[in-house]
């Protein structure tokens, strides 16, 4: 049965119950050989049964490795249990509908550092709230509820403590007024006062909004315990105790343990977890994975977005532009870099001429241009990698479509990189003395622009794969070096071993270099570049057309190379989308 998708906030009150939840990791040592595993699956959780009520905080407590985060993932419908069921008011949940009335706050905060607290809330509210007219009122009310009003215009990169950043994370999860709030170790990394303030605010939210709060916590202080309503004490994936804190001491006495006067009951229970597990005969579970149960839940996990794709792209593009505008130093650096490199290159090759030396210099100048343009975009790699956790959190939560993010990113970088391409082209083209026609200059700008877009897509794709900045930088460096090596600049296609020939056709450098050469020497196709003087006669030895023919090029290939470069641009965007989609799917599974 399916829960009501949009319950009224005033009356919605759900009691969440789990019945014999188990989660296993199958033995995979022989799975690659398609032989059945000889060992039983490894249990992460065994027979977890719990109840969480509205207006209350249920704290999942236990040592590291007890299964707290896995249980939170299951309760947040991010992971499907291998057996057991989750019920709301005694009705089995539908994961798709359940996500609409629940919200999950991960352990690590991730925001755009250049946005203010108010802007961060407003962006999410525009995508989550049905009526745009209530966005401002909702954000103002939420800032007040979280005691963040005085920080509303403070950027997240500066001036916020760990506790305040954690409250921003909680605020983002409250924007659509969920019935359930699930938090993975919200006090992790906070001092005692900040940790207490966070739990106190969560308790206020639970009571004032009639909501259910479930959180995991490693070992809460006595002050925090005074706020928490119920405990679920885990040890090695099994329930040791589930109930109120004031009943824990009686439970320990029943088991034959007396709480020492210097410890509270939870501290003592944490010290004797092994003995408590051994004394409990109900912790041995024989639940086996239910593949059908998991498949059925995955079929139901269809995310329905609240806004149209056009609205998502518009809002995301505005956020991108705002962030780019606030990185004015990076903007200025990119523009100055293009201008200075263009002028330096132009003065080195000034009035290059068209003779034999000019042919060699043009080839070298074009090769350097490609190396500079393709390598200059690597500075965006750390930005993309730092933004990736935010993207995964927002898309896995169903705030917007992943494809909308890719399209908005593309729309923002199109004009930005076009300006950079014009700055570089103007500074280098006329100083060197390349083909003096506006048609050739326009084509040169177009090729430079597409090269920058292609390089940007390439870096974006690698940033979706790389686990960190160091690995990403290594990948970019190695692949760009390989593409340059097989571009035909160092070794011709005819000289390549057959088993490396595929790299010649996969090289981005090859098509960009061909496009620049065709543009230049098509202009000089009938012009003699090298003369042979004999007995007062001059014989033309090399024309522009001969240069192209020697490189295996033809004027008719002018637009073919542009189309291939555009194909690389689209290909790397699609590959980036697929890589991120896999990551998002992994965070939802």
Swiss-Prot record:
Entry keyword Transport: yes
Residues annotated as binding ATP: 62-69
Record PROSITE patterns: ABC_TRANSPORTER_1, ABC_TRANSPORTER_2
Gene3D superfamilies: P-loop containing nucleotide triphosphate hydrolases
Topology term for the membrane: Multi-pass membrane protein
Keyword DNA-binding included in the entry's annotation: no
Keywords linked to the UniProt accession: ATP-binding, Membrane, Nucleotide-binding, Transmembrane, Transmembrane helix, Transport
InterPro entries named in the record: AAA+_ATPase, ABC2_TM, ABC_transporter-like_ATP-bd, ABC_transporter-like_CS, ABCG_dom, ABCG_transporters, P-loop_NTPase
Any one Gene Ontology molecular-function term assigned to this protein's record: ABC-type transporter activity
Domain ABC transmembrane type-2: 311-521
Example of a GO cellular component annotation carried by this entry: membrane
Top-rank lineage group of the source organism: Eukaryota
Membrane spanning residue stretches: 335-355, 365-385, 412-432, 441-461, 470-490, 499-519, 560-580
Subcellular location(s) per record: Membrane
Entries under Pfam families matching the protein: ABC2_membrane, ABC2_membrane_7, ABC_tran
Residue ranges of domain ABC transporter in the record: 16-261
UniProt similarity note: Belongs to the ABC transporter superfamily. ABCG family. Eye pigment precursor importer (TC 3.A.1.204) subfamily.
Name recorded for this polypeptide: ABC transporter G family member 8
Annotated organism of origin: Arabidopsis thaliana (Mouse-ear cress)
């Amino acid at each position: 049965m399916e829960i009501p998708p949009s319950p009224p906030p005033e009356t919605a009150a759900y009691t969440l119950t789990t019945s014999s939840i188990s989660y296993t990791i199958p033995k995979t040592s022989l799975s690659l050989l398609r032989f059945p595993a000889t060992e039983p699956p490894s249990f992460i959780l065994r027979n977890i049964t719990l109840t969480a009520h509205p207006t209350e905080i249920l704290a999942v407590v236990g040592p590291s490795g007890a299964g707290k985060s896995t249980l939170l993932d299951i309760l947040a419908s991010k992971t499907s249990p291998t057996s057991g069921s989750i019920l709301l008011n005694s009705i089995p949940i539908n994961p798709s509908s359940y996500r609409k009335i629940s919200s999950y706050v991960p352990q690590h905060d991730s925001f755009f550092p250049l946005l203010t607290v108010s802007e961060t809330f407003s962006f999410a509210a525009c995508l989550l709230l049905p009526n745009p007219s209530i966005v401002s009122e909702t954000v103002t009310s939420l800032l007040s509820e979280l005691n963040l009003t005085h920080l509303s215009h403070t950027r997240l990169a500066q001036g916020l403590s760990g506790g305040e950043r954690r409250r921003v994370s909680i605020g983002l999860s409250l924007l659509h007024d969920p019935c359930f709030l699930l938090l993975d170790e919200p006090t992790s990394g906070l001092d005692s006062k900040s940790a207490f303030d966070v739990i106190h605010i969560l308790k206020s939210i639970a009571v004032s909004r009639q909501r259910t709060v479930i959180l995991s916590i490693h070992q809460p202080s006595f002050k925090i315990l005074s706020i928490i309503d119920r405990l679920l004490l885990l040890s090695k994936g099994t329930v040791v105790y589930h109930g109120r804190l004031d009943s824990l001491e009686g439970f320990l006495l029943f088991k034959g343990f007396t709480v020492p006067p210097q410890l509270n009951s939870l501290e003592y229970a944490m010290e004797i977890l092994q003995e408590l597990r051994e004394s409990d005969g109900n912790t041995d579970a024989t639940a086996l994975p239910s593949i059908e149960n998991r498949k059925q839940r995955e079929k139901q996990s269809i995310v329905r977005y609240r806004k149209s794709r056009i609205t998502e792209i518009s809002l995301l593009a505005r956020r991108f532009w705002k962030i780019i505008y606030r990185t004015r130093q990076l903007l200025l650096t990119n523009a100055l870099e293009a201008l200075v490199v263009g002028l330096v290159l132009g003065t080195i090759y000034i009035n290059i001429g068209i003779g034999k030396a000019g042919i060699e210099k043009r080839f070298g100048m074009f090769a350097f241009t490609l190396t500079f343009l393709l390598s200059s975009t690597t500075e965006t790699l750390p930005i993309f990698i730092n933004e990736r956790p935010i993207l995964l959190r927002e898309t896995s939560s169903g705030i917007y479509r992943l494809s909308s993010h890719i399209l908005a990113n593309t729309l923002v970088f199109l004009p930005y990189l076009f300006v950079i391409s014009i700055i570089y082209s103007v500074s280098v083209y006329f100083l060197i003395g390349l083909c003096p026609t506006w048609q050739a200059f326009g084509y040169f700008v177009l090729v430079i622009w597409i090269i920058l877009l292609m390089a940007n897509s390439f870096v974006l794709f690698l940033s979706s794969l790389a686990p960190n900045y160091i690995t990403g930088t290594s990948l970019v460096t190695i692949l760009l070096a390989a593409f340059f090596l097989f571009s035909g600049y160092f070794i011709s296609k005819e000289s390549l071993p057959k088993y490396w020939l595929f790299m010649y056709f996969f090289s981005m450098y090859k098509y960009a270099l061909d496009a620049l050469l065709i543009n230049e020497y098509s202009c000089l196709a009938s012009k003699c570049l090298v003369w042979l003087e004999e007995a007062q006669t001059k014989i033309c030895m090399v024309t522009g057309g001969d240069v192209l023919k020697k490189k295996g090029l033809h004027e008719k290939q002018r637009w073919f190379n542009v189309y291939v470069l555009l194909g690389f641009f689209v290909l790397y965007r699609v590959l980036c989308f697929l890589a991120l989609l896999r990551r998002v799917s992994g965070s939802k599974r």
